């Protein structure tokens, strides 16, 4: 199974939406709960965050490949769709 790294920032409204979307998707699809997600707080773990190329949070990598990077103005529905793409890309 592939590993997901999700970079988030404390106080980021898009990151909050991504976490809510992740929880909603896991509630509705048990197989998503099997996918390991490492939620990395950029402001608390800069040593890890600095190793990756992104500008906006949330950003999600699947096995070191960037699959999703948020951008300003995204709606909850857009974020949920992107998080689901990441979860679908993760199973081996």
Name these PLM-found stretches.
Residues 49:
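A hydrophobic alpha-helix adjacent to the NAD(P)-binding/active-site core of NAD(P)-dependent oxidoreductases
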Residues 32-46:
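Thiol-based oxidoreductase modules, predominantly thioredoxin-like and allied folds used
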Residues 62-92:
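Non-catalytic, surface beta->alpha helical segment in thiol-disulfide oxidoreductase systems
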Residues 13-14, 44, 74:
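Short alpha-helical
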Residues 1-31:
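Local sequence-structure signature of Cys/Sec-based thiol-disulfide redox active-site neighborhoods
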Residues 52-62:
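Structural micro-motif
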Residues 19-22, 53-55, 75-76:
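Short, glycine/charged-enriched secondary-structure capping and boundary segments
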